[in-house]
């Protein structure tokens, strides 16, 4: 890695820690349901309209049913909005109805916090669909993930006695408070900053401008729209779906180096803050630091692979005498598919950030990365999106691995495993197994179906190892709710829209339900005191055990598939 790459990484991590600490403190207060009176007065009319009482905590099953029902209604609404947009207002470009299969895929994508996009926003979606459908789900899907994390944290924190025994909180109160007091204020501040940098925010009709050189088309059409407001929650909510087809590579979405840095910080802000919130609510800040340390170590390791892989360039160019060395006058390395204004360091770091989190935003085409460089984003997703991960989903995913780690440690020393004073028993381990195995089954089975089916093979534009990698990446992205793509795959077809839509829905909610069941089970248990035989879960030894568990359990499932795709491609390229 170059000195500029190290400097960018250090600046990014330092700024992230400084900003995440106070946000984590506020999230802990919300998780503990310590809401000031003035906030309660603002919330009260919403609860009255909804017919719910925020102080009434729910059993995990009731919490899960409310969550699933809310998200199902959201999916139906977004689907209907796309199908009807041709007859609705705020459609200056005259966009017609989205096809049924694409509308289904997009509705599931945004409700599940995946934001996989098989369409180009500027040529498919009206302003109303973008604002009322997609942007609203950016808020609600993010709030849903944080709410599940809150429920699991409460499961650890509650004593297992009294009226709160077995209860995990009120979904409607969590959803309202997270949206009103976390996501909306942060998004407003970030959107104003983006506007100051040059991100557009308007309802103008598309503009036709004359280019410097005359063209047969007579000019260029510039798409407009309310971009800044959607861009903010796109990053803060680890959503990733771009207003434009080029996503954050588009100058109207990401116009400057400073905006680019803030976008990366925004992606990790809430996942990092939730680690601090977890430590505070659990009554031991060291627990939060341990989880954050494990995430950070794996993230830095990924960055240390992807940046040099891109900086080394393409050996086929080297054989032609092309200068690919980094220097004062050029970025060097593999610049295919990258914005010159960002270069290799920022592009590779952005790719690591958005695939470590379940964001999916891009400033470079991952399909144009070197085989090794492209494998890093794929592996970060296949780990289960627990390296920071999505808002909420990253923390509850990592806590699932933490419970598995203490279970393995308990087997090695012959003690009943416990984490934060709660015994990890047969019921929890069955649910943990389900939560961990859902996504590998979806990814590998979906990939097998796609490479066997004629409709799946028809979408491959690059036969061979890279074509297989494109399919594996698409299923990894969908099932792990990331949303980025190796865009060489033609995925906006009925086959892929259906397959990926199913993977996105199950990858989201077939994990959330067992996590909530674990939360309810833990909340019903007494919290045991710490003894001399208790495994410390806050030191370097446990951090190492946790990282090892994530890598062994999360990654080994995919080694044969990776060997058929990026590994083969890398060996062929560098033979």
From Swiss-Prot:
Coiled coil: none
InterPro entries (alphabetical): KdpA
Main location: membrane
Keyword Glycosyltransferase (UniProt): no
Annotated transmembrane regions: 4-24, 61-81, 133-153, 180-200, 258-278, 289-309, 344-364, 372-392, 394-414, 431-451, 499-519, 545-565
Transmembrane found in the keyword field: yes
Subcellular location: Cell inner membrane
A GO molecular-function annotation: P-type potassium transmembrane transporter activity
GO cellular component: plasma membrane
Lipid bilayer topology: Multi-pass membrane protein
Record key words, sorted: Cell inner membrane, Cell membrane, Ion transport, Membrane, Potassium, Potassium transport, Transmembrane, Transmembrane helix, Transport
Subunit structure, as described in the record: The system is composed of three essential subunits: KdpA, KdpB and KdpC.
Function of the protein: Part of the high-affinity ATP-driven potassium transport (or Kdp) system, which catalyzes the hydrolysis of ATP coupled with the electrogenic transport of potassium into the cytoplasm. This subunit binds the periplasmic potassium ions and delivers the ions to the membrane domain of KdpB through an intramembrane tunnel.
Protein family according to the UniProt entry: Belongs to the KdpA family.
Protein name, entry field: Potassium-transporting ATPase potassium-binding subunit
């Amino acid at each position: 890695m170059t000195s500029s790459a190290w400097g960018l990484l250090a600046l990014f991590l330092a700024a992230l820690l400084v900003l995440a600490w106070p946000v984590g403190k506020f999230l802990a207060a919300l998780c503990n349901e310590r809401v000031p009176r003035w906030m309660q007065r603002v919330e009260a009319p919403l609860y009255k309209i909804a017919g719910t009482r925020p102080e009434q905590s729910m059993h995990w099953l009731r919490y899960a049913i409310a969550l699933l029902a809310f998200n199902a209604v959201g999916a139906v609404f977004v689907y209907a909005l796309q199908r009807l947009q041709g007859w609705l207002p705020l459609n200056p470009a005259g966009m017609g109805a989205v096809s049924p299969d694409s509308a289904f895929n997009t509705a599931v994508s945004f409700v599940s916090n995946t934001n996989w996009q098989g369409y180009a926003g500027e040529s498919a979606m009206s302003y109303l669909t973008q604002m009322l459908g997609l942007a609203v789900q950016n808020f609600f899907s993010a709030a849903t993930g944080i709410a599940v994390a809150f429920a699991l944290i409460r499961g650890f924190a509650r004593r297992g006695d009294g009226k709160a025994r077995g209860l995990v909180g009120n979904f409607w109160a969590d959803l309202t408070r997270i949206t009103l007091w976390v996501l909306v204020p942060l998004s407003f501040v970030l959107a104003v900053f983006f506007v100051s940098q040059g991100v557009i925010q308007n309802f103008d009709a598309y503009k036709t401008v004359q280019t410097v050189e005359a063209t047969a088309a007579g000019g260029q059409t510039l798409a407009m729209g309310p971009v800044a407001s959607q861009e903010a929650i796109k990053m803060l909510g680890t959503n990733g779906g771009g207003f434009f087809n080029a996503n954050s590579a588009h100058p109207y979405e990401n116009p400057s180096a400073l905006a680019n840095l803030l976008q990366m910080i925004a992606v990790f802000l809430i996942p990092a803050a939730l680690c601090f919130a977890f430590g505070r609510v659990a009554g031991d800040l060291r627990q939060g630091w341990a989880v954050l340390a494990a995430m950070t170590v794996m993230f830095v390791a990924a960055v240390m692979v992807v940046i040099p892989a891109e900086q080394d360039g393409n050996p086929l160019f080297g054989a032609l005498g092309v200068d690919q060395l980094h220097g004062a006058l050029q970025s060097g390395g593999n610049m295919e598919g990258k914005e010159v204004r960002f270069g290799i360091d920022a592009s590779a770091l952005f790719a690591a950030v958005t695939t470590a989190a379940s964001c999916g935003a891009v400033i470079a085409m991952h399909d144009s990365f070197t085989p090794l460089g492209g494998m890093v984003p794929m592996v970060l997703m296949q780990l289960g999106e627990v390296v920071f991960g999505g808002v909420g989903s990253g923390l509850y995913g990592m806590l699932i691995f933490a419970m598995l780690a203490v279970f393995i440690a308990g087997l090695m020393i012959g003690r009943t495993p416990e984490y934060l004073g709660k015994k990890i028993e047969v019921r929890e381990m069955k649910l943990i197994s389900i939560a961990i195995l859902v996504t590998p089954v979806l990814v590998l089975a979906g990939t097998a179906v796609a490479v066997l089916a004629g409709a799946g093979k028809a979408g491959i534009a690059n036969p061979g190892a890279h074509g297989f990698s494109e399919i594996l990446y698409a299923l990894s992205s969908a099932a792990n709710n990331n949303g980025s793509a190796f865009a060489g795959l033609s995925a906006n077809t009925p086959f892929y829209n259906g397959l990926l839509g199913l993977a996105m829905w199950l990858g989201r909610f077939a994990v959330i339900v067992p996590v909530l069941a674990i939360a309810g089970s833990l909340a019903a248990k007494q919290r045991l005191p710490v003894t001399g035989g208790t495994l410390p879960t806050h030191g370097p030894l446990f951090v190492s055990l946790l990282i090892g568990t994530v890598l062994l359990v999360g990654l080994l499932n995919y080694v044969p598939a990776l060997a058929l795709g990026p590994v083969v491609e890398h060996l062929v390229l560098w033979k």
